[in-house]
Amino acid sequence: VYSKAELESLANVFRKHPQVYIMSDEIYEYINFEGEHESIAQFDFLKDRVILINGLSKGYAMTGWRLGYIAAHATIARACEKIQGQVTSGATAITQRAAIAALTGDMRPTAAMVEEFTKRRKRVMELIANIPGLVCSEPQGAFYVFPKVNQFFGKADGTDTITNADELCMYLLNKAHVSTVTGSAFGEPNCIRISFANSMENIEKGFARIREALARLS
């Protein structure tokens, strides 16, 4: 999660390059564990070049409703509308009504959700600390952990040899029946992503299986 100071430093770099436009995906703006959400769109000298992408999937737990939006300068928004209008015929009326209710309603359900995610984050970090070889920073937002797993590269369980994060993810899926995502999808090939958007019971079971599967690698 970027701090305001970090965003300001980036903004000052972009100030020197007026040809650059900034696309900022802020879908997790309400799922913060440390401080308030900060947007790069807050800097007036950049606001005409920022395309802010958001939606209702994360902060309002409306993943299945499939409704997102952008906030941008009118010229950019109109150009996007020309393309988007040819891709879909429009959001359904019931989805639009639900979105209005979410965006104009109180934030207590979201606050309760973040409180629960905070508890899960704490437990997940405890579970990771008990798995030899996993190294993980505590996430400041969203509902994922991103542990380093490169200590397992080159190891095998007798049948499978792990050479990268992609293979480790397949190993965990096939041997532990736990689904993870390779860090190479996010530009970090030494990590894997694990979601804790699940029940505490399933989190406990999942990490127990991960621990057992990784312990078989030598």
Task: Please provide the spans of the model-predicted regions.
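PLP-dependent class I/II
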Residues: 1-218
